[in-house]
């Protein structure tokens, strides 16, 4: 009994000693910083503000906290690495655009090293010569206007295949379809052509790449857990995630490596990457990054748009009438890639979808790469800043009825605040490199899917679930299932 009590006392003493040591380190870390931290919620020892960050999506929680503590606040996340959260378009513009070079560094979860060649991809690396060259290569070669224009015939053929696949699925399931996988595979084909310069009629590579992306999505939540809570990396679930990430890495290498032996056309991303004499792993994961960020962002946003149109049949009908009139006036049945920017209501629906459900509601964290300032207050080098895109898109002083899906708002005259607050692809020097392709493919897919089918609920009164999950992009918690009726 005495030994048992001694063991308990020893354990308690050890815990208290560790706790005291942690507090001392914490206080020293704070006193050493010259950053003038904005106000934020009170913290608890060890966990910081972690106790108030759960219960719902993080971007929503942070938006609600900003309403209490201000549009620029400090959140302490588990490991006592403070993060400045920006929820106001003026301050977001200061960080992302006006002082873009000051806040252009990155700080990523350790687990992401596995799938980024040790943070040597466009989205994961700090700004610098390597980052600038890699980004310029993607934009000026694979995503150049000339190269994208050369893909239009392929995109139009892909949409015909997509429509046929949906019709076939509907015929087997009493009119019901699950469009997301079809959308993803169409985007995999498009990105594959931009990377390799060859067509992928054989679905094997498309299926395998799609499967790897899906596999990574399933474990992405653990990477986020490690991001917000340092000690999560010691949990068994996180260790399983690391094992999963290593498995995904092996699968990606096995998929992409055979293409490195080819002699690709000069207007392809692969040719550019090989010309830079990068290590094999850098080339492979630069290619995989294009898939990872391009496939799910485009397909998920299209699925969100279809869900909104099912919930708002009058909006769907108005969009269909615009598409119907346009195709009739041009004596054809389908929309071409070149048409999408000539359709104002389509573009209004596209913008409103990206406002309501931005691809990344929390922008990838930026880090100050030198001593700088925010709102005239000192910010130390190494300070982490995160812009809450969701908050910018749902601020009542900028958006009338911000939680209502209302494309008409973009057909009216709007002020500078609306323009600067709509940032689905972020802004400044680290704006999404694939922004133009993403918008184009989203607009083109949505236009033809609404032109080809009437979209409705799977059963009367059962509307699509608009709950979301934050992974690499903002996903639908319940993948969209809909009933379609062919219009053509």
From Swiss-Prot:
Cofactor(s) in the UniProt record? heme
Q: What is its EC number?
A: 1.14.19.68
* GO annotation terms (biological process): isoquinoline alkaloid biosynthetic process
Main location (coarse class): membrane
Q: In which pathway does it act?
A: Alkaloid biosynthesis
Known catalytic reactions: (S)-tetrahydrocolumbamine + reduced [NADPH--hemoprotein reductase] + O2 = (S)-canadine + oxidized [NADPH--hemoprotein reductase] + 2 H2O + H(+)
Q: For this UniProt record, give its keywords in alphabetical order, as a comma-separated list.
A: Alkaloid metabolism, Heme, Iron, Membrane, Metal-binding, Monooxygenase, Oxidoreductase, Transmembrane, Transmembrane helix
As for subcellular location, the record says:
Membrane
Q: List where the protein spans the membrane.
A: 6-26
GO cellular component annotations of the record: membrane
Single GO term (MF):
monooxygenase activity
Q: How does it sit in the membrane?
A: Single-pass membrane protein
Q: Record-annotated residues binding heme? A: 432
The protein's job, in short, is: Cytochrome P450 involved in the biosynthesis of the benzylisoquinoline alkaloid noscapine. Converts (S)-tetrahydrocolumbamine to (S)-canadine.
Q: Which family would the database say this protein is a member of?
A: Belongs to the cytochrome P450 family.
Please identify the protein, giving its name as recorded: (S)-canadine synthase CYP719A21
């Amino acid at each position: 009994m005495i030994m048992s009590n001694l063991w308990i006392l020893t354990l308690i003493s050890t815990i208290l000693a560790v706790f005291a040591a942690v507090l001392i380190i914490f206080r020293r870390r704070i006193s050493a910083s010259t950053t003038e931290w904005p106000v934020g919620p009170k913290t608890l020892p060890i966990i910081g503000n972690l106790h108030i960050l759960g219960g719902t999506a993080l971007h929503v929680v942070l938006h609600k906290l900003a309403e209490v503590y201000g549009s620029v606040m400090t959140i302490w996340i588990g490991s006592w690495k403070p993060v400045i959260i920006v929820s106001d378009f003026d301050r977001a513009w200061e960080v992302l655009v006006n002082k873009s070079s000051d806040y252009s560094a990155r700080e990523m979860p350790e687990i992401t090293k596995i799938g980024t060649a040790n943070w040597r991809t466009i989205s994961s690396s700090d700004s610098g010569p390597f980052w600038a060259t890699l980004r310029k290569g993607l934009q000026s070669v694979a995503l150049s206007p000339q190269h994208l224009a050369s893909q239009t015939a392929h995109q139009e053929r892909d949409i015909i295949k997509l429509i046929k696949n949906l019709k076939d699925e509907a015929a087997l399931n009493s009119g019901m379809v699950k469009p997301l996988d079809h959308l993803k595979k169409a985007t995999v084909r498009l990105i594959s052509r931009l990377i390799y310069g060859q067509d992928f009629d054989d679905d094997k590579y498309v299926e395998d790449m799609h499967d790897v992306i899906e596999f990574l999505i399933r474990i992405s939540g653990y990477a986020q857990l490690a991001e917000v809570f340092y000690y999560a990396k010691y949990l068994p679930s996180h260790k399983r995630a690391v094992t999963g990430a290593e498995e995904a890495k092996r699968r990606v290498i096995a998929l992409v490596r055979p293409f490195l032996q080819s002699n690709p056309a000069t207007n392809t991303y692969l040719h550019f990457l090989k010309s830079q004499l990068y290590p094999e792993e850098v080339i492979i994961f630069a290619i995989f990054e294009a898939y990872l960020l391009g496939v799910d962002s485009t397909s998920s946003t299209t699925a969100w748009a279809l869900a909104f149109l099912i919930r708002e049949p009058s909006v769907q009908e108005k969009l269909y009438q615009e598409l119907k009139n346009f195709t009739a006036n041009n004596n054809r049945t389908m929309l071409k890639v070149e048409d999408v920017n000539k359709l104002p209501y389509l573009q209004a629906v596209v913008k409103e979808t990206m406002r309501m459900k931005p691809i990344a509601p929390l922008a990838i964290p930026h880090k100050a790469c030198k001593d700088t300032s925010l709102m005239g207050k000192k910010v130390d080098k190494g300070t982490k800043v995160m812009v809450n895109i969701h908050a910018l898109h749902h601020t009542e002083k900028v958006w009338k009825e911000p939680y209502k899906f209302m494309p008409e708002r973009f057909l009216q005259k709007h002020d500078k605040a609306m323009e600067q607050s709509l940032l689905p692809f972020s802004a400044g020097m680290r704006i999404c490199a694939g922004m133009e392709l993403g918008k184009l493919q989203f607009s083109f897919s949505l236009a033809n899917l609404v032109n080809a089918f009437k979209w409705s609920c799977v059963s009367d009164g059962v509307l699509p679930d608009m709950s979301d999950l934050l992974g690499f992009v903002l996903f639908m918690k319940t993948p969209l299932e809909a009933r379609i009726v062919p219009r053509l």
